[in-house]
């Protein structure tokens, strides 16, 4: 006998028709997947632990719609389950300024992550599952289980075809993340037509090879009991589970099973027959029977609110039993760092020895790692090069492997840069003040640009430790030497891109990156040693740009970043011998500098002083700050780092020569600062 009633089936039909009505009202959107996935959504959400009155409750279950184009389904669920999503909001689907944008966006209560670029959501979900396992292993005690939530995911064929999902799913299998349950919408349709035009692999065997539990629901269109049974079985597994859910895209539509129902509104006659088929009045839209509201209120909302109350009481008891850990949990849930943590940050003087900035980064991480338990680090198989693993760190690994445990805070991502980026977004989205950081070579952050862009769009404050930041890496040559990379990432809104020149600037980069709650950061670091510079300080560098060394009435300003700043300082000495006075400006982060007042920016780059930028990467983007740019608008070369710098004339004399030409060119001309603009 089925555990589901006619009211459950009415609820499924309600979900379907709310999604269809949204798409029809907007005359835009994707009705096909919501029609096919509504039964699974009903089964999952009905048993989820959630509290719509406290959507950020840390021990809630999480739902990720990786196939974000099906967002009309998610918005319907948010309305039905009591979140801040009204029928009027649904009627404004895809309208400018609405709560119902064309793909789910992170800031909306109940939306766990921004999805749309396929494959990102399932990868974010892996990150959430990692964070939950780590939080549980760190704080759970006998009789005090603070964390035992699940992460559920919907994904489609498109997600599975994107490489990022393979990277993340492979790692999830290795890590045996049993709190992760994914539903694969096996509807056999893509935008181009039947899936067989491009995709005929055995997804089940693929995920079995990853180390996942794989189950199959043959009739995902209306077999609620089979879906529920698969879900119960998944919860018994000691591994992540993929439930292959065979559905019909556009179920109930006249065009069901066709690619035409994927991304276009149903025609009016189709909508009417669909409503008749599901027992609704064909002349009415956005209808929710009271029985459906009552069903979800009784099955999910009221129990969720009560579970949250019980959890709050459990936390209070936990604080009494484990005062130190309890205070730490409360601090993290409040999104705060420990008082005085900044005292752990190192500072430097010019008398200190020259050190590679990747090593300076390691020193910062070593100093703060024990103080900040929310740091969850890792590297894409470059730990010895990135220097990202702190002394005494334990690896995040399944205990069964003997390689670490789930309380470990260092993740071996393998050669999976894109997966790492998307997983870090999920770790951040989990909450509890998690601050993930991941290491790779700067050039290979480009592999993960899709995830980096979503970090910035969503405001996930993840940190990329991006070493080997220039031709200075030497012998590995142009395949590994970044050229366009910084210009690309600097163009992304809400993204810090640091290229520190010495120890104080490395410290400043981490200080700003860690204290900023809504902006991710890439910290580009050198392989070669860099001197500690006269005039640098953490206090100046946190502004993103500052005058490192100044002169009275400068003939020009040389602005630079990273390893070239020290060379620019030497170039100024060459120029001084020719009676040319150069102001030296260090600009480690365009974004942070852009946050300063216009008055401050113009004090660094005033009218009347020609500006030459020097950076051994592409010159694109430098016109914002400089009149002339000396950079590398070609690929690098293989050889010893100093020899490669010499080849491309990034030497004191090479910079001085271009500085002289800049001074000569602007002599007698009115020089307006590039920052002195109309708006």
Swiss-Prot record:
The active site is at residue 417. Mg(2+) binds at residues 157, 187, 189. Its cofactor is Mg(2+); Ca(2+); Mn(2+); Co(2+). It is an enzyme of class 2 (transferase). SMART domains: Transket_pyr (SM00861). It holds the Pfam family Transketolase_N. The record marks 30, 262 as: Important for catalytic activity. Binds 1 Mg(2+) ion per subunit. Can also utilize other divalent metal cations, such as Ca(2+), Mn(2+) and Co(2+). Binds 1 thiamine pyrophosphate per subunit. Its EC number is 2.2.1.1. InterPro entries: THDP-binding, Transketo_C/PFOR_II, Transketolase-like_C_2, Transketolase-like_Pyr-bd, Transketolase_bac-like, Transketolase_BS, Transketolase_CS, Transketolase_fam. GO terms for biological process: pentose-phosphate shunt. CDD domains: TPP_PYR_DXS_TK_like, TPP_TK. It catalyses: D-sedoheptulose 7-phosphate + D-glyceraldehyde 3-phosphate = aldehydo-D-ribose 5-phosphate + D-xylulose 5-phosphate. GO terms for molecular function: metal ion binding; transketolase activity. Keywords: Calcium, Magnesium, Metal-binding, Thiamine pyrophosphate, Transferase. Substrate binds at residues 30, 262, 358, 385, 468, 476, 527. GO terms for cellular component: cytosol; nucleus. The keyword Cell membrane does not apply. Belongs to the transketolase family. NCBIfam families: tktlase_bact. Homodimer. Catalyzes the transfer of a two-carbon ketol group from a ketose donor to an aldose acceptor, via a covalent intermediate with the cofactor thiamine pyrophosphate. This is Transketolase. It comes from Kluyveromyces lactis (strain ATCC 8585 / CBS 2359 / DSM 70799 / NBRC 1267 / NRRL Y-1140 / WM37). The gene is TKL1.
